[in-house]
Amino acid sequence: WQLGWVAANDGNVSVKLPDGNFLVTPTGISKSFITPEKLVIIDKDMNIVEAEGNYKPSSEIKMHMRCYTERDDVGAVVHAHPPTATGYAVAGKSLDEYSMIETVIAIGSIPLTPYGTPSTNEVPEAIAPYLAEHDVLLLQNHGALTVGCDLITAYYRMETLELFAKISLNAHLLGGAKEIPKEQIDKLLYLRDNYYHVTGKHPGYKHYNIS
């Protein structure tokens, strides 16, 4: 919320705990008002293990749990509405391009997943096919989702996404982004694996749905 990625009760965060349970932000409360004791602990079946008062887990918890189910390496999930990245999602446009070195190394191309009604199984079903190769997703007409081995990694990926969206928008206003050639992409991916040792998944040089 401090960066303007969410407003009011928007957005949600979850973290996998060492005992196999999950720490989740509560539903119906602004992120600016959340204190540690207001966080909710649930089990893998989304049953509440520990919660203060009447606090319940985020209404988007099904989306979070699908990430953990699909990927054993996921330790945290962040969902937010960063304005520029979400602008792409609302416009029906992906960020499925290879035009900035740092983004290629850190997260790769960013697909736009199909529309799904929040809080239902539609969103988990929509994102599932993309999780095998992506740590960062745009949710059509909704926002953005990032996963990571831990919370700081998932957060950094959301930050990287929003900055890239801003740069991409500026590039398109200037006539269009210039894509990096495949042979250069291969070199960057080598650096990702052998120098930076970036965790998570990467689609390689692959396009899903440029629009």
Predicted segment positions?
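Glycine-rich flexible loops
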Residues: W1-S211
